[in-house]
Amino acid sequence: HIQVLDGKTAVTHVDIVDGDRVFGKYEEGVLADFKLREQDISFIKKHDLAVTGIWGMIEDELPLISKEIPVAFDFANKFANPIVEKAIPYVTYAFFSFDEESRNEFRQKYHSMGLKEKENCMEQLKEFMKAMQQKGPKVIIATLGKNGSIGYDGNSWYRFGIIECKVVDTMGAGDSFIAGFLYGILNGLNVQDSMEAGAQNSAVTIGYQGAW
């Protein structure tokens, strides 16, 4: 089930520096005007889960979709993007990526929310996750690169490290973590074990060149 639109396909330019992906120019192409049709929404609602993200262009349809099925949303490292506040009330599983390149944007968002000052970045991240989880998500997860991941469900905190492996190309590590986590959740695993499933999946992906 796809939409075929006239125009250029969206393109992401990526460099690999010492095994780590560095994003460059993004050409939005036909995605600039992409909208879900009624038949697309009906198709999505037939499934167990809807998975989208910051560049998915379907935040306007989330109120409809989330009434029928759970929604997983990859906010990447775009903490200050307006889509975060727009989408978060309709998201069941929220994912953020906390990395060096997003520290300034994270601090900007953190201070704009009026959250309490904390002694270090990790404590600030936890305060942010608590505030975001209260806006709607059942579970919120932040991936931390080589430091693993952290999760919060409104009652408990969860931590999982990484699976030791040879790193060839980190492209797709976050996507693979999300896929593994959601596979675990859909198969009845708890949050902790689903985080491990995500880490296992990422470890396979980053062993391949150009895995995304």
Language-model region placement:
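Conserved N-terminal subdomain of the carbohydrate kinase-like
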Residues: 1-48
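Active-site donor-binding loop signature of nucleotide-sugar glycosyltransferases
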Residues: 26-28, 96-98, 162
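Conserved phosphate-binding/catalytic region of the ribokinase-like
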Residues: 107-212
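Structured loop/turn residues at beta-strand edges in well-structured enzyme cores
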Residues: 42-45, 89, 135
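Structural motif
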Residues: 11-12, 20-23, 49, 70-71, ...
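Acidic, amphipathic alpha-helical patches
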Residues: 40, 84, 167
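Conserved beta-alpha-beta core of the PfkB/ribokinase-like small-molecule kinase fold
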Residues: 49-127, 146-149
